[in-house]
């Protein structure tokens, strides 16, 4: 079939209109040619010939005109490399106090929070340092490559572009690190970095507030890692990663202060709303200024107590000793939260089958459960304050007493030092059962009725909720999801919690975990350890911070 030149032009135009060359299948192309044949020849019998002709005469695509590239002066070196680590070149910024945070490119500041940070930095004589991170650099006007990256000018005088040490070479602000705000765990991989660089502490700028403790060999310092939170608004790509991250965005910063020995103390600063207001200990920072305040601390959760193995120095700094004041007297919290108050050392299920352990307890005069109870009760008595209600969160070590009393293999006839107490407490348990008293707590009973201690604490039961400022404080952390072992990372799915159990201070999402008030060496923690003596402060606005005990104090 011969197609005239006039009809060829018409057929090519119609093929373009019907996207003939965009069809992959021959059958689909023939359907298009049926329509073309009908319109050009008033019959479909020429569709095959038209299809063959179109395939043989596909128009060539016009070549795009080449745009001449602008010639740039490339000042990059041809090669580089050093033998020593760059850490040796990091500047040491002098000063006693620093406030550090981060900002995102092409993003407005949280103006009130920035104003509060500036006010607080001036109030305490701190340097304000800001690191930068890049995200979604092509999502803004003129955003092709580095030329489109902008940071709000309000931060210009605070920008820190290089990794620096603060005060001394033990704590580093790694301001060069670019951590995407969508990262689930901003500190992932930096534990090895801290160890390799011999850093005792490090902080990186990130949109999330997190904290981790790096395990150390026995007798060595547990390294601490922090991410700052950010002083810029939420600005995320509304896809899966962005929407996940947006929900966990923290308007936050860290205060890092140093004592005369160069020891660092870090606390989290976070504003919970558009006001920009935040607390640090007894100071309230606002965009208009800072002032001392009271009645703003809802909760002080101590690191796990373990009364029989208590660190007396940490305890004295926490709730005082004799005529001395402790942290509780400074903060005056509405509630004190106590985890693992009782260690149950003398007959703990981990050791009571060991003849060597029992012999050591006997030789030390510590083989009586009653003595453990008295120690525990005395600790609770020393915590008593008129302004604060003590809450005992039921914990695995607290439950060790009832586990012993219900253990058919306890062989109490071979334990005369504890036989009378064993039977007395069991009698109380069975009496409560007979009375259908579901609220009976054998540890509470033993401390008050047997050990003769007087205190006004409330004992929670396992799974009993106790919330302050929307934060669950009734979970110790030993029971995980669906019968598994508890783990702070696992608890992220449960919302905002303050937990204990691990003796390892951390922040993962809405889960803050305290350390320990007891000794850092309890005998059974053999090998490397990430334990720290760390409490949790919860403010009335829902803001929280970890607070560490070092050098006999909680702050510089």
From Swiss-Prot:
Transmembrane segments: none annotated. It comes from the Viruses. One of its GO terms (biological process) is symbiont-mediated suppression of host gene expression. Induction: Expressed pre-early in the viral replicative cycle. Expressed with a few other proteins from the first step transfer (FST) DNA. FST DNA corresponds to the first small portion of the genome that enters into the host cell at the beginning of infection before pausing. The keyword Transcription does not apply. Keywords: Bacterial host gene expression shutoff by virus, Degradation of host chromosome by virus, Early protein, Host gene expression shutoff by virus, Host-virus interaction. This gene is part of the long terminal repeats present at both ends of the viral genome and is thus duplicated. Involved in the degradation of host DNA and the shutoff of host genes and phage pre-early genes. Together with A2 protein, involved in the second step transfer (SST) of viral DNA into the host cell, which leads to the complete entry of viral DNA into the host cell. Homooligomer. Interacts with A2 protein; the two proteins form heterooligomers. Part of a complex containing the host RNA polymerase, protein A1 as well as another viral protein of 11 kDa; these interactions are probably involved in the transcription shutoff of pre-early genes. This is Protein A1. The gene is A1.
């Amino acid at each position: 079939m011969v197609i005239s030149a006039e009809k060829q032009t018409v057929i090519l135009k119609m093929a373009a209109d019907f996207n003939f060359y965009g069809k992959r299948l021959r059958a689909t192309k023939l359907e298009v040619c049926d329509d073309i044949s009908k319109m050009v020849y008033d019959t479909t019998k020429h569709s095959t010939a038209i299809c063959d002709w179109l395939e043989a005469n596909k128009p060539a695509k016009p070549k795009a005109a080449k745009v001449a590239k602008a010639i740039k002066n490339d000042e990059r070196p041809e090669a580089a490399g050093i033998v020593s680590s760059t850490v040796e070149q990091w500047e040491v910024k002098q000063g006693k106090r620093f406030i550090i945070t981060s900002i995102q490119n092409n993003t407005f500041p949280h103006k009130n929070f920035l104003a509060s940070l500036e006010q607080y930095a001036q109030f305490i004589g701190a340097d304000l340092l800001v690191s930068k991170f890049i995200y979604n650099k092509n999502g803004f006007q003129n955003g092709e490559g580095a030329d489109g990256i902008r940071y709000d000018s309000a931060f210009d005088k605070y920008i820190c572009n290089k990794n620096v040490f603060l005060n001394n070479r033990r704590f580093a602000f790694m301001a060069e690190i670019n951590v995407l705000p969508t990262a689930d765990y901003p500190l992932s991989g930096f534990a090895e970095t801290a160890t390799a660089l011999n850093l005792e502490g490090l902080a990186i700028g990130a949109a999330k507030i997190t904290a981790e403790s790096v395990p150390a060999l026995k007798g060595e310092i547990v390294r601490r890692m922090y991410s700052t939170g950010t002083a810029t608004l939420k600005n995320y790509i509304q896809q899966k990663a962005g929407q996940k991250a947006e929900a966990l965005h923290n308007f936050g910063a860290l205060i890092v202060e140093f004592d005369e020995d160069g020891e660092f103390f870090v606390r989290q600063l976070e504003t919970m709303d558009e006001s920009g207001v935040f607390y640090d200990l007894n100071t309230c920072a606002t965009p208009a200024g800072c002032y001392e305040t009271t009645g703003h601390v809802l909760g002080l959760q101590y690191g796990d107590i373990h009364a029989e193995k208590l660190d007396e120095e940490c305890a004295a700094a926490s709730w005082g000793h004799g005529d001395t004041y402790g942290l509780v007297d400074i903060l005056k919290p509405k509630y004190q939260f106590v985890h693992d108050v009782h260690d149950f050392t003398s007959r703990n299920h981990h050791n009571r089958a060991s003849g060597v352990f029992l012999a050591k307890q006997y030789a030390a005069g510590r083989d009586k459960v009653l003595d453990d109870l008295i120690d525990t009760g005395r600790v609770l008595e020393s915590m008593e304050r008129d302004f604060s209600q003590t809450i005992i969160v039921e914990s695995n070590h607290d439950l060790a007493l009832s586990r012993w009393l219900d253990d058919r293999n306890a062989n109490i006839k071979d334990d005369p030092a504890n036989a009378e107490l064993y039977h007395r407490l069991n009698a109380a348990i069975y009496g409560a059962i007979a009375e259908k008293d579901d609220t009976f707590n054998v540890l509470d009973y033993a401390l008050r009725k047997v050990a003769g201690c007087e205190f006004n604490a409330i004992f929670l039961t396992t799974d009993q909720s106790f919330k302050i400022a929307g934060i669950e404080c009734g979970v110790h952390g030993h029971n995980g999801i669906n019968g598994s072992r508890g783990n702070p990372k696992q608890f992220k799915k449960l919302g905002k919690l303050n937990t204990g159990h691990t003796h390892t201070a951390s922040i993962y999402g809405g889960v803050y975990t305290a350390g320990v008030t007891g000794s850092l060496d309890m005998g059974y923690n053999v090998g490397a350890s990430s334990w720290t003596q760390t409490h949790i402060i919860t403010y009335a606005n829902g803001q929280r911070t970890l607070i560490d005990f070092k050098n006999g104090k909680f702050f510089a």
